[in-house]
């Protein structure tokens, strides 16, 4: 490829609204062009990288037995009604009408679509298992699109679905796909982790995320420093904590505690640890057609993890869509006083009460007395009936691993893949069934598997690039080598550059010849910005001594290559990371 023919509209400066280096570099280097909020055009350089990512993905998925299909981007809203997700998914789901007043959605995920295909065409256990996948455009109407391709509204996704006759078969395919994803991300040269995760709006009994470690990541994962335990902070667990020694011994009584509203101040007032204080957190619960209040109790030195709290509500049948902060007006309307909320008589004030599981059989506790400036001491939860307990706390770095007691540590990460065991939920709601070996009708066991193809462009750059521009991995760079001529007006340099270019092409090297009549410094700046893996300099040194300066983009390390071994050395360098 000649640079003069390459459509790569580089910019002098990155977009002013770009925060992440991946967004800055992709826009400035001419990879992407923004159409609207969270919507991007992929220009030739980006398309080359996308094609490489997609080819690796196709190869690994098909090696593991998955079959490639292409489903409609537009889906009937009635299918989403049947699954119950039309309302549950929220405003991120874009719904529209056609000219005949039929309702459709632009699909962010395709569980409904693929389940309908299975319901119509898979009739017998003899056709199972089957794993179908696609790489296609998706749309999610994000409320705050940001960070370029990391949180875009329109994006490219690899999503797959598997159908099984029983849970055992699903378990095998879940692990099979996990292996395929590990191979894909390894081929892409990424440092990643597999973590236990929440299933979110997709649902299911078990899910794992594939996350790339990067300080710009939107997610926090909790990783054990001693074993392989890793989980998204939204579902991370810990081992049982030892109880502090200074237990506040007291009979149940009410004490005046003026202006003492935080767990820390209550603990200091009673000369004990926040561990023994019941911290009450009241949230507004958003349902499909109403709003209610829920109160969550955790120990005073813990914080609420809202994803866990929302899941706990739905386990007890709340059908909650989201949680929001309850403001002072909400509390006043419910007859509650911030800072003095406790379990006694609370049921008449809120619709749901959930205690963290660490409080089971808790005694010697201090709690709000549901009266201004008063707390109750000597609270014993064993004296209450029908309390609901669940894991609802956010793990701290001072906590210990639930598997080995090792130290837990936070890492910032960016999710690039997710696999789910969906079970029979979608099959039942969409009446997708088959006949088993006994001739009885059974619902499919389903798995769901996704990789963010376009997000991977950003993930690679966030992990690998530097302040100068793009640094790609071995299998993702848009070009292997760019040949940079020191003085394009020197006919001898120009002639040698074309000769070297042809030699590299014959060896299968994806080479770019910078044939522009531009300053040498400007050409090298574009090399740093675009991120070809190597830059080969053709100048006076090459003409006079038959030696070429070669620069690795990854670390800007320089090497001198003799003309007689040029192709051999370049192939060696390209074969290494």
Curated annotation (Swiss-Prot):
It is found in: Cytoplasm. GO terms for biological process: prolyl-tRNA aminoacylation. It comes from Helicobacter pylori (strain G27). The gene is proS. GO terms for molecular function: aminoacyl-tRNA deacylase activity; ATP binding; proline-tRNA ligase activity. PROSITE patterns: AA_TRNA_LIGASE_II. Catalyzes the attachment of proline to tRNA(Pro) in a two-step reaction: proline is first activated by ATP to form Pro-AMP and then transferred to the acceptor end of tRNA(Pro). As ProRS can inadvertently accommodate and process non-cognate amino acids such as alanine and cysteine, to avoid such errors it has two additional distinct editing activities against alanine. One activity is designated as 'pretransfer' editing and involves the tRNA(Pro)-independent hydrolysis of activated Ala-AMP. GO terms for cellular component: cytosol. This is Proline--tRNA ligase. Belongs to the class-II aminoacyl-tRNA synthetase family. ProS type 1 subfamily. Its main location: cytoplasm. Keywords: Aminoacyl-tRNA synthetase, ATP-binding, Cytoplasm, Ligase, Nucleotide-binding, Protein biosynthesis. Its EC number is 6.1.1.15. The keyword Nucleotide-binding applies. Coiled coil: none annotated. Homodimer. Consists of three domains: the N-terminal catalytic domain, the editing domain and the C-terminal anticodon-binding domain. It catalyses: tRNA(Pro) + L-proline + ATP = L-prolyl-tRNA(Pro) + AMP + diphosphate.
């Amino acid at each position: 490829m000649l640079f003069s023919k390459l459509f790569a509209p580089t910019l002098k400066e990155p977009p002013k609204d770009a925060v992440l280096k991946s967004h800055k570099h992709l826009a400035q280097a001419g990879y992407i062009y923004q159409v609207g909020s969270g919507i991007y055009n992929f220009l030739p350089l980006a398309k080359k990288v996308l094609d490489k990512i997609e080819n690796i993905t196709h190869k690994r998925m098909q090696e593991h037995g998955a079959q490639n299909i292409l489903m409609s981007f537009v889906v009937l809203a009635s299918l989403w009604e049947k699954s119950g997700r039309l309302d549950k998914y929220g405003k991120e789901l874009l719904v529209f009408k056609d000219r005949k007043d039929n309702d459709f959605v632009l699909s962010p995920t395709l569980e409904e679509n693929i389940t309908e295909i299975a319901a119509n065409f898979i009739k017998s256990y003899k056709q199972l298992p089957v794993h179908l996948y696609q790489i296609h455009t998706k749309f999610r109407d994000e409320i705050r699109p940001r960070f370029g391709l990391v949180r875009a509204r329109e994006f490219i996704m690899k999503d797959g679905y598997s159908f099984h006759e029983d849970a055992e078969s699903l378990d095998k395919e879940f692990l099979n796909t996990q292996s395929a994803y590990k191979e894909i991300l390894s081929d892409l040269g990424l440092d990643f982790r597999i973590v236990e995760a929440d299933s979110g709006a997709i649902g299911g009994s078990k899910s794992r995320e594939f996350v790339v470690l990067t300080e710009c990541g939107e997610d926090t994962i909790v990783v054990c420093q001693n074993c392989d335990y890793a989980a998204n902070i939204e579902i991370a667990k810990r081992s049982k904590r030892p109880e502090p020694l200074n237990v506040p011994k007291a009979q149940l009584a009410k004490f005046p505690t003026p202006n003492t509203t935080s767990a820390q101040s209550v603990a200091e007032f009673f000369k004990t640890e926040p561990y023994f204080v019941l911290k009450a957190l009241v949230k507004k619960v958003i349902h499909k057609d109403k709003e209610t209040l829920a109160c969550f109790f955790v120990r005073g030195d813990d914080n609420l993890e809202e994803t866990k709290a929302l899941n706990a509500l739905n386990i007890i049948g709340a059908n909650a869509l989201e949680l929001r902060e309850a403001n002072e007006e909400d509390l006043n309307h419910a007859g509650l006083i911030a800072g003095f909320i406790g379990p006694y008589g609370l049921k008449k004030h809120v619709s749901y009460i959930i205690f963290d599981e660490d409080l089971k059989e808790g005694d010697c506790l201090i709690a709000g007395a549901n009266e201004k400036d008063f707390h109750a001491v000597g609270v014993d939860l064993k004296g209450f009936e029908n309390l609901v307990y669940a894991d609802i706390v956010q793990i701290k770095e001072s906590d210990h691993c639930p598997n080995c007691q090792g130290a837990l540590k936070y890492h910032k990460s960016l999710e690039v893949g997710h696999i789910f065991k969906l079970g029979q939920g979608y099959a039942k709601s969409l009446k997708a069934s088959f006949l088993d070996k006994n001739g009885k009708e059974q619902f499919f066991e389903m798995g769901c598997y996704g990789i963010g193809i376009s997000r991977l462009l950003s993930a690679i750059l966030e992990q690998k690039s530097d302040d100068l521009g793009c640094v790609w991995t071995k299998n993702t760079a848009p070009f292997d080598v760019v040949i940079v001529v020191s003085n394009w007006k020197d006919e001898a340099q120009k002639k040698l550059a074309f000769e070297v270019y042809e030699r590299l092409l014959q060896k299968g090297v994806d080479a770019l010849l910078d044939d522009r009549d531009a300053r040498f410094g400007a050409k090298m700046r574009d090399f740093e910005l675009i991120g070809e893996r190597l830059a080969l300099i053709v100048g006076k040194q090459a003409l006079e001594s038959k030696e070429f300066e070669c620069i690795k983009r990854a670390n800007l390390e320089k090497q001198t290559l003799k003309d007689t071994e040029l192709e051999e050395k370049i192939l060696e360098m390209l074969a290494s990371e």
